[in-house]
A protein has these predicted regions:
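N-terminal catalytic or cofactor-binding beta/alpha core of small enzyme domains
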Residues: 1-173
């Protein structure tokens, strides 16, 4: 189910409440994507913003504009904590949902699936930001990711980051 910013804010606050109730040791954000492809920069931009603003040592951010996380290197991530709650963040394509919408899925995500890449699902939940249309064609999808609207993705990433940063203020790890 896709969500407006208000709905995303509500749903993400429910996630933080669940993390508080279950007593996880750490909160880890895996921000997937690359700054080399505009449409795939949603995760790294969020990672960059979170890294600059998160001061709690129990909240870790993996993946940003300098250190990209992708379907190849994701399997090498080490959490170095006992019982983390992992939130993966990535760009997504959709043939029915307009770019600029966001949704939370209650399972991990498989990075690179829009380009038929094989990887292991990662995360307790995932935040997916729709950045372009899914054409059901590898070549067209790659083209859509390369030519996505940078201003939309930058604004979109900043708004989602702001909601995340406001919500994690209520985290009790």
């Amino acid at each position: 189910k896709y969500q407006s910013y208000a709905n995303f804010n509500f749903e993400f606050n429910k996630v933080i409440k669940r993390v508080n109730e279950k007593r996880y040791s750490d909160l880890i954000f895996i921000c997937i994507g690359t700054n080399k492809i505009v449409g795939d920069s949603f995760g790294p931009i969020i990672g960059e913003i979170l890294k600059r603003n998160v001061k709690d040592r129990k909240i870790k951010v993996i993946g940003d504009l300098t250190n990209n996380i992708n379907s190849k290197n994701i399997k090498n991530i080490k959490y170095n904590c006992d019982n983390p709650y992992v939130i993966s963040i990535d760009s997504a394509l959709s043939d029915t949902i307009e770019p600029g919408n966001v949704f939370i899925i209650k399972k991990g995500l498989v990075p690179g699936s829009a380009l038929n890449k094989k990887a292991t699902a990662i995360g307790n939940i995932a935040i997916k930001g729709i950045v372009a249309k899914d054409e059901k064609s590898l070549i067209k999808n790659y083209y859509n990711l390369k030519n996505a609207d940078y201003k939309l993705i930058l604004k979109f990433s900043k708004n989602i980051s702001k909601i995340i940063l406001q919500s994690i203020k209520f985290l009790n790890l």
